[in-house]
Amino acid sequence: MIPFSQIEEQYETFSAFLKVKNETPIDIKFKKLNENAVLPRYAHDGDVGMDMTAISVEYNQEHDMYIYHTGLSMESDKHYGAFLFPRSSNRKTEAYLCNHVGIVDCAIYRGEILFCFKNRDSLKTIASQAQAEEFMCTLSGKPTKYNDFNVQEGTAQDAYYNSLKAYEEVIHNPMKYAPYKEGDRVGQMVIFLYPNINTVETKEELSETERGTNGFGSTGN
């Protein structure tokens, strides 16, 4: 592993180091917290992200999310960090990372690397849908208890009960809806290098630019 102090001595600027950093492999330590853990690996030479494999999964009902354990912790030199992204194959699922992009402070964090996913058809979504459909049933004067009438397919009552059944099924069998299973590659890790930053408060006006204060959507669609 290359100490950052040596980098600063060898190169005058951070950008100068970036130009040659790929020529020198960087050692990142990974510790297996479980014998079944799989070390991160590149699927192809030239890949940016290393595939991360789940060794177990648990469902957290309170937050309606699936927690995937990698069984790995890691250590890097100062000034290195890691991004956690979903894999491109995630598009085949209805899941997304809870924090969208994870950041591992691997120079100081020694805990397990986890991936937390939520399904777009979450419990809250299903519950909200059921409440809306129940309201529609109430407006139409239809009973909302299953035994009070024969449910006809395609009606508001039918949609309401389907939502209730879906909600109960997630509660009683959450793993059926897990986006990934044990042994799947659930995400990817990208190692990045970052410089020291000094925040400097200024009383002076910032330099003028062509863009100025134009914000969201200022360049058009």
What does each model-found stretch correspond to?
Residues M1-N221:
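DUTPase catalytic domain/fold
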